[in-house]
A protein has these predicted regions:
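Structural core segment of the AMP-binding/adenylate-forming
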Residues: 4-79
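AMP-binding/adenylate-forming catalytic core of the ANL superfamily
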Residues: 12, 19-22, 27-31, 368, ...
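Short gly/Ser/Thr-rich phosphate-binding loop of adenylate-forming enzymes
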Residues: 56-60, 220-234, 265-281, 286-309
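Conserved pre-ATP/AMP-binding loop-to-beta segment of ANL
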Residues: 70-71, 83-106, 113, 136-142
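Conserved AMP-binding A3 loop
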Residues: 102-128
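Conserved ATP-binding/catalytic segment of the ANL
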Residues: 107, 344, 352-359, 363-418
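Active-site loops of AMP-binding adenylate-forming
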Residues: 121, 296, 305-309, 317-335, ...
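Conserved AMP-binding/adenylation subdomain of ANL enzymes
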Residues: 125-142, 149-250, 258-275
Length: 553
């Protein structure tokens, strides 16, 4: 038909809906229920759209909203039976070109004001052709999805799932409920945000912590043996970024083979005693988990892949419809987002947009069939992100190996510049801090300051368990203000920070956290966090500006 869809979640606010509506002036609005209709009719329309409601309406409802042209989903099905045989409709559909706009996805992401990303049919079709490079799927297999149905990554998955005759299971972002769904359905593939995999790992370690001392020691021993076995296996198989020939390669291979032989008996025994039981958490059919971006802690990726739960990290943006790079099933390169997709050109450039002459860290630029048409009615913003050479500035700081394997380090706009001129990427520090069971979320701050500070949202359940373990009073979970003011809690968090952010873990002196403050209010999706559970840094820096100011007094 050539129509353009503009998907949005049911959690859309009236403010956001008005911005989008007044920009695109849609002729038809499809809503899930009457609650959403009641919100949308508050918008001051220039031209009233046709409303389609998924749920059925009774006669009383139709009279109540008689000022609007409203149809139900059932009405549309009846219309469709007639229209699909209409020769005029068939002719219109035949004239749709692959380069025509297919969708506008409005995204605020981590920055704030929504922008409309225009994607063509060709953009979306490129994602379909690229998907098979990640996993080899079969008809009837079950694909569990956690992201909202309108999200660009989810849409890419959905097109492929239906095209290949698979079954799509939509689950929830709540880990416990998701695990119940896994138990009931036994999916083959699971696509989820990093936070969910982190939560599963934390729950595993939480259960282990309840075991007797000997059982805990056995678990940690076999995990270390599995780590060693996995590292050696990847060295032997060449599953690491190619940064050029080194005389140490042959030595590494020999050491890898030796290490693999030594670790194999312990890994095999660990599988029988421990890991096979853990793997059952994800059902009997599990093949691979897919997660996106660079926000997955390396320790979590290593843990899962070492014990036999393969996680394949991928990378993309809504502006790239979304896929840019992906790891491949059975060929995962730990700590990276995999290889740049075929047909895509990637470059690492400096802050001025010049391509780096030597391999190093810089801003990732990409050019290919997946790059968006532009931002809807925003030529200025489009020109800022897509250059005259067709390359799109992802805004991500990355490294690119000789064989096109990409490693995402952080966001260009997130870079903190201390007053001594040192540049700090907050993401690796935050990811490391969140490895602590006591820390739910961490936000590193310190722009133009002498040192770094951090806003820490504690894991209050784990804090109370810690207090109990050291013989201290347990607080009412609802009395968060009292918990964050407790000196024992403050010392415990400080000890965790020092244990994680230090030279031994690869952090430089100026990257260490010298001051922190504890937050009592949990982060919310749509406020402090995006739908992908990434922190919305600009919102947090503004909302907690007084707390940040007090860190540097």
């Amino acid at each position: 038909m050539g129509a353009v869809d503009i998907p949005k979640g049911s959690d859309v606010t009236l403010f956001e809906a008005e911005i989008i509506f007044n920009s695109v002036l849609p002729s038809v609005v499809i809503l899930e229920n009457l609650n959403l209709l009641n919100m949308f009719i508050q918008i001051k329309f220039t031209v009233k759209p046709i409303f389609i409601i998924i749920e059925n309406l009774n006669q009383e409802d139709r009279l109540k909203y008689s000022d609007f042209e409203i149809y139900t989903y059932s009405d549309c099905i009846l219309f469709g039976d007639t229209l699909r045989k209409d020769s005029e409709i068939i002719e219109i559909a035949s004239k749709v070109d692959s380069n025509d706009m297919a969708t506008i996805i409005y995204t605020s992401g981590t920055t704030g004001h929504p922008k409309g990303v225009m994607l063509s049919h060709a953009n979306l079709l490129y994602q379909v052709s690229s998907f098979s490079l990640m996993v080899d799927t079969h008809v009837g297999q079950i694909f569990m999805c956690i992201l909202p149905i309108w999200h660009s990554f989810q849409r890419s998955f959905s097109y492929n799932i239906f095209l290949k005759g698979m079954v799509c299971l939509f689950s929830t972002i709540v880990p416990r409920a998701m695990l119940d769904d896994i138990k009931n359905v036994n999916p083959h593939y699971i696509a989820a945000v990093p936070r969910l995999w982190i939560a599963i790992r934390q729950n595993i370690y939480k259960e282990v912590s309840k075991k007797p001392f000997i059982s805990r020691m056995i678990f940690h021993f076999f995990v270390k043996a599995a780590f060693l076995s996995d590292i050696c296996y990847r060295v032997v198989m060449g599953l690491y970024p190619d940064n050029g020939f080194s005389l140490f390669f042959p030595i590494k291979k020999i050491l890898g083979i030796f290490g693999l032989i030594c670790a194999f008996p312990f890994k095999a025994l660990g599988n029988v005693l421990i890991f096979n039981k853990i793997n059952k958490i994800l059902g009997n059919n599990f093949v691979v988990g897919i997660t996106g971006g660079g926000s997955m802690p390396l320790s979590a990726v290593r843990f899962f892949n070492s014990i036999g739960i393969e996680l394949a990290n991928a990378y993309g943006l809504t502006e790239t419809s979304p896929g840019v790079a992906s790891n491949k099933h059975k060929k995962v390169i730990i700590g990276t987002c995999g290889k740049i997709l075929p047909g895509t050109v990637a470059e690492i450039r400096d802050i001025d947009g010049n391509k780096l002459k030597k391999p190093g860290k810089g801003i990732l630029f990409v050019k290919g069939p997946q790059v968006m048409l532009g931002y809807y009615k925003d030529k200025e913003a489009t020109c800022k992100i897509i250059g005259s050479d067709g390359f799109l500035n992802t805004g991500d700081i990355a490294k690119l190996s000789k064989d096109n394997v990409v490693q995402i380090i952080g966001r260009e706009k997130d870079t903190i510049v201390l007053n001594n001129g040192e540049n700090v990427e907050p993401a690796p520090i935050e990811i490391k801090l969140e490895e602590s069971a006591l820390i739910e979320k961490a936000v590193v701050v310190g722009q133009d300051q002498k040192f770094l500070g951090a806003l820490i949202l504690p894991n209050f359940e784990e804090i109370n368990k810690y207090l109990e373990s050291v013989g201290q009073k347990i607080f009412d979970a609802n009395n968060r203000r009292q918990i964050i003011a407790n000196n024992i809690v403050l010392k415990a968090i400080n000890d965790e920070i020092k244990k994680l952010i230090n030279k031994a873990n690869g952090f430089k002196p100026f990257e260490q956290i010298l001051k922190f403050t504890l937050l009592e209010k949990p982060f919310e999706v749509g406020k402090e966090m995006s739908i992908k559970m990434d922190i919305k840094r600009s919102y947090i820096l503004n909302f907690y500006k007084n707390e940040i100011k007090n860190l540097f007094i």
